[in-house]
Structures are given as C-alpha cells and as structure tokens.
UniProtKB/Swiss-Prot annotation:
This is Ribosomal RNA small subunit methyltransferase A. S-adenosyl-L-methionine binds at N11, L13, G37, E57, D85, N104. It comes from Campylobacter jejuni (strain RM1221). Belongs to the class I-like SAM-binding methyltransferase superfamily. rRNA adenine N(6)-methyltransferase family. RsmA subfamily. Keywords: Cytoplasm, Methyltransferase, RNA-binding, rRNA processing, S-adenosyl-L-methionine, Transferase. The lineage of its organism: Bacteria, Pseudomonadati, Campylobacterota, Epsilonproteobacteria, Campylobacterales. The keyword Magnesium does not apply. It catalyses: adenosine(1518)/adenosine(1519) in 16S rRNA + 4 S-adenosyl-L-methionine = N(6)-dimethyladenosine(1518)/N(6)-dimethyladenosine(1519) in 16S rRNA + 4 S-adenosyl-L-homocysteine + 4 H(+).
Amino acid sequence: MVKAKKQYGQNFLIDKSVLAKIIQAIPKEMNNIIEIGPGLGDLTQELLKISQVKAYEIDNDLIPILKKKFQKELECGKFNLIHQDASEAFNPSLDEKPYFLVANLPYYVASHIILKALEDKNCLGLIVMVQREMAEKFCAKEGNSEFSSLGVLSAMICERKILFDVDPQCFNPPPKVMSAVMSLIKTKDFDELCEIENFKNFLKDCFKAPRKQLLGNLKTYKAKVLEVLSTLGLKENIRPHEICVDLYLKIYDKLKDEYGRKQRDK
C-alpha cells in the first residue's frame, strides 16, 4: 500500500461514485485531457475510457506504479506520463494542442495552477477538486463577501459552477476540510480584455484590504479613482467585493497606463 506524502499534499480519492460524477461532468467534445497528480491512477483509468490523457506526476514513487498499471495505454500512445511538477510546466502551455484539465489538486498549490491554466490559451476549461473554501472564492459573485480577485479573474473569461461537495471520508487519508468539485469553462481569453499581468497587479491593490473601501486601497490614484467612480455612478465608499467584473475593467481602463508604467519600472 502506497502512503500519501504530506509534502505533496496527497489525499488519494477512493470513492468510485465521485469518480463517476467527475467523468459525467466533462463536456462531451473533449478528446485531449490533461490530468495533474494522477496519484494511483483511479481517475486516470476512467478518463482513458473517454479520451487520450497526458498526466503530470511529481512523486518518484508513483511513476513505476502508473507505468505498470497503464503499460498498454503508454505503448499505444493513448496515455502520456510526464514526471514533472505541473506548476512549473506552463511554458507557456501544458500541451501544444487545445486541452481540458481534470485534477484532484493539492490544496497548497491549487490556486496557482488554476490561474496558470486560465492564462494558458490552449486550456479550454477545467474540472478540478479543491478545498470547498477555494471553490467558493473562484465561483463567488459580486456582492458576496467571498468575492475576491480569484472570482473576478475567473468570471472574466469563464462560465463557473460548483458541481458538488466531497466529504473527507472519500479520501485516504481523509483531509481535515471539506472538498468540492468545480467547473470553469472558458468562453474567451484574457488578452481579449486586458494585459493580464498589469490587471492582476491592479486587482492585488484593489483587494489588499478586502473589507476596506476601494478608494482607500487605491489611494495612490485617488483623484483618478474618484473621477471614475463618479462617471460610473458608484458611491465613494464602495468596497471591493461589491463591484462587478465589467466595472473593474472600466476602472482599470482609466488606470492602465499607470500600471503599465509600474510594470516597466520594475
């Protein structure tokens, strides 16, 4: 029996009914799937029934187990196993062809990988299992106290949905928190809307004190922000979680030269 390793945030999914629900949720036309952290290969086995699969696995001890389990699929080219940390594999894409991402993501690296995937032009969307709290952040709507930069970024380019919760007892070892499977289906790319690095820096400033007023978080640009809020008919004491994506893009549009300059001066 292989023991899960804490340093990789491993919690092996052992509930077959959860695997079935994940497979059912994958859009039918997806025929190139990337999996991150295949673990013991239980989800991989189901994915291979509907698509070719490329899997990224960081754990040395799991590579021979996966090679043995999927020897036939590896030989015929239906399965491609990459021994690499997936978070370092976006150069800039996880694959040269359009792909759909499916994963039970380690909690410590989940937000980083999801954002990288959203920025990857070849990624069509993703269905991932993450900590319930993180799924709520990615799928939150404006006005909800959970609405943050993660919610803004995902709402900009995706149709978003929390599909179902997953109890700790569905894993070995059981995590200390509730998990959830969420779906982010891309409808556009960031570069159709903004220069993403500058926009992320702008959002970082907007949400640096999420319960404070937006004007206070952007006090460096107070005069311009006041002008924009007035033009858009927004109250001066509005808070970051109360602003929708379209308005964030409009506010950023007035400040983008400042953020472009900041990026160049780094």
